[in-house]
Amino acid sequence: MKLAIFGGTFDPIHAGHLAAAREASTRFALDRVLFIPAAHPPHKAGVTHAPYDDRVRMAELACRDDARFEVSRLEEGTARSYSIDTIEKVRAMLAPGDGLYFLIGADAFAEIRTWRRWTDVARAVRFLVVSRPGHTYEIPAEVTVDRIDSLEIPISSSEIRRTLAAGGIPEGLPPAVLAYARDHHLYN
C-alpha cells in the first residue's frame, strides 16, 4: 500500500488542498491520502481560528466523495502536533514495505529545517511538495522530494476566512464546507 500523510490546520480546508491530494493520488498511484488536521501546530501556536472539532468535520465533509481520502483524528488531544510523532504513529499502522509519503505545500516545506527531528522525518517519508504561487524552497540533501509543479492554485485559507468574515462567498470552498462554516458561525 502507498499512503500519503497530508497534515495541516485546514482552517478551513479548500479546493487547493483537495486538488493537491487528487493530483498526488493520481501521479504517484497512492492508495490513500490521510488528512490529519493539526490539533496544536507548533509553527502556528495560537493562530487557528476554528476549533479542532469543526476543522475535522469540515475536512470530513470535503473528503467524503473520494474513496482514497480519509480524515484522521490522530493528533487529537496532543499538546503539540509534531510531524515526526505523527509519522511514527502512522508508520506503526502500516505493513513493512508499505510506502509512506508526506504531502506538503512549498511554503511549509521551506521551513523543514526548523522542524523537530527533521532529519528523522526526512528518512521516514518521501515528500510530495506542491508548488505555491510566490513560494520558493531549497531541497536539503537529506530529503527525498517529488515536486508537484502543475497545480499553482491561488487559494489560501486566510483569504477564505477574510471573505467569510466580510459576509462574502469565497472561491475555492467546497459547498458543504461553506454551509458548515456558516451554520456554525465560523470565521465571523
Curated annotation (Swiss-Prot):
An annotated Gene Ontology molecular function: nicotinate-nucleotide adenylyltransferase activity
CDD domains: NMNAT
Annotated Gene3D superfamilies: HUPs (3.40.50.620)
Recorded superkingdom: Bacteria
Alphabetical GO biological process terms: NAD biosynthetic process
UniProt enzyme class: transferase
Keywords, sorted A to Z: ATP-binding, NAD, Nucleotide-binding, Nucleotidyltransferase, Pyridine nucleotide biosynthesis, Transferase
Reaction(s) catalysed (UniProt annotation): nicotinate beta-D-ribonucleotide + ATP + H(+) = deamido-NAD(+) + diphosphate
Pathway the protein takes part in: Cofactor biosynthesis; NAD(+) biosynthesis; deamido-NAD(+) from nicotinate D-ribonucleotide: step 1/1
EC number: 2.7.7.18
InterPro entries membership: Cyt_trans-like, NadD/NMNAT, Rossmann-like_a/b/a_fold
Family: Belongs to the NadD family.
Listed NCBIfam families: cyt_tran_rel (TIGR00125), nicotinate (nicotinamide) nucleotide adenylyltransferase (TIGR00482), PRK00071.1-3 (NF000840)
Stated role: Catalyzes the reversible adenylation of nicotinate mononucleotide (NaMN) to nicotinic acid adenine dinucleotide (NaAD).
The protein, known as: Probable nicotinate-nucleotide adenylyltransferase
